[in-house]
Amino acid sequence: MSASPIADYHAFPDAQGHFGRYGGSFVAETLVGPLQELAQAYDQARQDPAFQAAYDRDLAHYVGRPSPIYHAQRLSDHVGGAQILLKREDLNHTGAHKINNTIGQALLAARMGKKRIIAETGAGQHGVASATVAARLGLECVVYMGATDIERQKINVYRMKLLGATVVPVTSGSATLKDALNEAMRDWVTNVQDTFYIIGTVAGPDPYPRMVRDFNAIVGREAREQMLAEYGRLPDAITACVGGGSNAIGLFHAFLNDRQVEIVGAEAAGDGIHTGRHAASIAAGRPGVLHGNRTYVLCDDDGQIIETHSVSAGLDYPGVGPEHAFLADSGRARYLGITDEEALQAFHLLAHTEGILPALESSHALAQAMKLARERPRDQIVLCNLSGRGDKDVHTIAAREGLVL
């Protein structure tokens, strides 16, 4: 990956949805028209002050924004080195960053006259957030979820059902996030007239990567303003976990042109990248096409997508958002692997030092933040996106420790 100078990172994507050589739209002919309709509707909505006002109102009064920045002082003292700050997306309604995006897309669905929304989910947080906004707006909701993920995220499955959603188990492939996304795509092709597909990450064909980014960019805008207001400066480094990468690009985007801020994504290294049991698409993947866009993917020598592994259902995906692929190639961001064990250690450490249970996805970012902090002096700041809360993962962690709850 060779770095090349980029004058303005906010100028991407281009009119065709490309982030450099990544992104674009590689879909069946039956989806070309619906995607063009969606792009046109989104571009009109984002220029409409009434739509923006409705979105901002829901973020404030329904989601509970802004989310605070919290100085994890006891954690920082324990780790040594730089101060670790947490952007508390875990405090949002539904417990994660996902609702920033689902609120925006659901409002767009209603504006387009769609009566039914579908979604894919891995950890269940996007499914819960989609079911939540569907209930809020009176829309039918169907969520596709891999059977493997249903087993490890039973609480979120029940939450979706309580909210009135239908949860469809997906048993094909590895029965995880990529397979759920495949089935949701098939549903959309069949029912495009009345159905809106709320993709939960910054992947998929254009306009999804930019649309999901834009709805999550509130995270970084708030964080940047909060840093300047509370500390009079920007952080020295920022980090977030990266599966598809929606929470990460949400934080990163506001800082992309602040060249003095180091940007590091934490990918799921699973049992270790050397073992092959991981989901580190940038660290160990190659450029290819997955789910309608060109990006880094995990595939074999024949180009077939390989099965992934992560203790975190939300990071268990064989691709990454095209903007992250672009940022990696340009040298603006680094993407490093965090193993299951490192994430679990970070989970327990935050619980013990700060009284906060982070999601397993967020625990990867926390582990990376701790590594960055150790390398830096005490007067520097590492800002970590705590993308979600860990209530959903308690059963998974207990099971790994031999406990039955």
Swiss-Prot record:
> Which residues in this protein are found as N6-(pyridoxal phosphate)lysine?
K98
Does the keyword Amino-acid biosynthesis feature in the UniProt annotation?
A: yes
Per UniProt, the enzyme's principal EC class comes to lyase
- Taxonomically, the superkingdom here is Bacteria
Q: Which UniProt keywords apply?
A: Amino-acid biosynthesis, Aromatic amino acid biosynthesis, Lyase, Pyridoxal phosphate, Tryptophan biosynthesis
SS bond partners: none
Write the Enzyme Commission number(s) for this entry: 4.2.1.20
One Gene Ontology cellular component annotation held by this UniProt entry: cytoplasm
Q: In which pathway does it act?
A: Amino-acid biosynthesis; L-tryptophan biosynthesis; L-tryptophan from chorismate: step 5/5
The protein's required cofactor(s) are namely: pyridoxal 5'-phosphate
Q: Which GO terms describe its molecular function?
A: tryptophan synthase activity
| Catalytic activities | (1S,2R)-1-C-(indol-3-yl)glycerol 3-phosphate + L-serine = D-glyceraldehyde 3-phosphate + L-tryptophan + H2O
Does the record's keyword annotation contain Lyase? yes
Summarizing the function annotation, the protein's role is: The beta subunit is responsible for the synthesis of L-tryptophan from indole and L-serine.
Q: Which HAMAP family does this entry report, sorted A to Z?
A: Trp_synth_beta (MF_00133)
Quaternary structure, per UniProt, is:
Tetramer of two alpha and two beta chains.
Per the record, the similarity remark reads: Belongs to the TrpB family.
Q: What is this protein called?
A: Tryptophan synthase beta chain
The scientific name of the source species is Stenotrophomonas maltophilia (strain R551-3)
